Amino acid sequence: MNDELKQVMAKAQEWLDGNYDEETKAQVRAMMEADDKTELIESFYRTLEFGTGGLRGIMGPGCNRMNKYIVAQATQGYANYLLKVQKENGYKNPVEQVSVVVGHDCRNNGRMFAETVAAVFSANGIKVYLFESLRPTPEVSFAIRHLGCQGGVNVTASHNPKEYNGYKAYWEDGSQVLMPHDAGIIAEVNKVKMEDVKWEANKDLIQIIGGEMDYDYMQAVKSVMIDQEAILRQKDLNIVYTPLHGAGRQIVPMCLRSWGFQNIHVVPEQMVIDGNFSTVVSPNPENAEAMTMGMNLGTKLNADLVVASDPDADRIAIVCRNDKNEWVIINGNQTNIMYHHYIINNMKKLGKLRPEHYVVKTIVTSELIRKIADREGVTLTDEYTGFKWIANRIREWEGTRKYIGGGEESFGFLPYDAVRDKCSPSAICLICEIAAWAKDHGMSLYEYLLSIYMEYGFQRETTINVVRPGKSGAEEIKQMMVNYREHPITEIAGSKVVKTKDFQLLKQRELKDGQWVESDIVMSLNATSNVLQYFTENGLKVSVRPSGTEPKIKFYFEIPADMPTPKDYDKATAEAEALVPAIKASLGI
């Protein structure tokens, strides 16, 4: 028996000897007695890390798995931190009692984990508003703000495979926790031993919420509407929606109806709450396969568009018909381009655009959005990947400027500030308004997108993932970033690099009149991130970002190409994609 297995067996024995339920002990015992110790090792070789985004892992017994004990331990640490901050009078407006919102999505064990979270919070004297059943992530964010709570938890693993569940921690503004509170919570969680957990729920402190909050949330979503007249004229827009078995199943159709849309169809098989996601290989709306049933129904009903939300209803997918009447999936960058263009231009036309308005994108999201904002004189800020950074920008500028929209290339968008996370109900309603407006002007949604390219120029966005598993892989990725910094790339696919950004050093270098000029990059909270960006003479942009959670390094390409007419879209796309091998070669991948 090697040293690792000895340590694993000792850790597993602690679970057999400890205060764990009999079912858990039986599962641990079976793993210990099995000839193949792989599952045992995977379950106990480390403790599931509470990171800056909370917890996420495969469900099962063991310290490296998502189960009620790990969830309770994390909640005890979070409760300790909330009470500590309150005691130190860290809030601007001290409250008599700390309160939190707790929600969950459709995943297996979600309700049990949410009730465990509520029990531990209440056992620590914290008031809990527990949703009666599954709800979208953005509604949890909304409820925290609406009820004046100091924090919250949503039990979800977003679009991960069915074996996973997770735990997202939120702060008083409805955003996922950010520095310094993320580090503070992590430190408290790491101090908690299982015997420190207070399990005995104080039921007087747990209040079930549901219908009234849904109504208030729907009213907030409705405030996003820009052109009600266009919707009224196109109220029969033919919409197919699928929640992919998740938390959008009730609220999204209700929101669409409240906006005035009357021709809404749902995919019945995927309206069933199902943590096994039985009708899809993966519940990730980025994957075309997940949209198959929606597209099939759309074909049958001759729909104008098909929209979907992921299991926790924060991200979206949009499918529309191209000029050949074929279904095409609109990627996350294209989605954000349409949102920003429509919001800025239509608010301007209707006299709603004001000087204090601003929009946000992440640093790896399309630069075409900057062109749109610049042309109309609207302030745009770049933030790090992850919606908590967009939420932080809203927090920093609250009271002085007004947020009107922001998003990231990974299929997330937020068109209002009543919520501080990605919001599929409002994003779906808004894309349907855009489709209605386009139809009102004799265009399909696809043709509207092409009209934006004709106005601002075409570019194709693509992402390359280079996977390097294991300890040696992590070292290789680290060395790749060192090499890029020590040996700067001067040319990509035959085009000279004229600007670079290093977000770890917060330095920008730009070629001006033949000389490199260095300047500082200003980011929220002066935070740094291990990201490099290159901009070339012909408008190419490359971003390099190691993943913080997976053994891979991501390369984001934005490739311009000529598109003289809308009919040249496919040709321009092919021309841009043909450059990818040359770009990869320049980067050594």
What are these language model-derived features?
Residues 3-4, 10-117, 206-239, 247:
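An N-terminal, well-structured beta->alpha segment
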Residues 15-19, 23, 39-43, 47-48, ...:
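Gly/Ser/Thr-enriched, mixed-charge loops and adjacent short helices
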Residues 44-64, 157-160, 243-251, 255, ...:
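Conserved phosphate/anionic-ligand binding catalytic regions in large, soluble enzymes, centered on
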Residues 101-164, 262-318:
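N-terminal small/polar loop signature for handling phosphorylated ligands or for N-terminal nucleophile
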Residues 113-121, 164-171, 314-334, 369:
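Short Gly/Thr/Asp-enriched flexible loops that form oxyanion-binding sites at enzyme active sites
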Residues 170-198, 333-357, 361-371:
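Glycine-rich phosphate-binding loop plus the immediately following alpha-helix
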Residues 299, 303-305, 326, 346-545, ...:
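Phosphate-binding and adjacent anionic-ligand microenvironments
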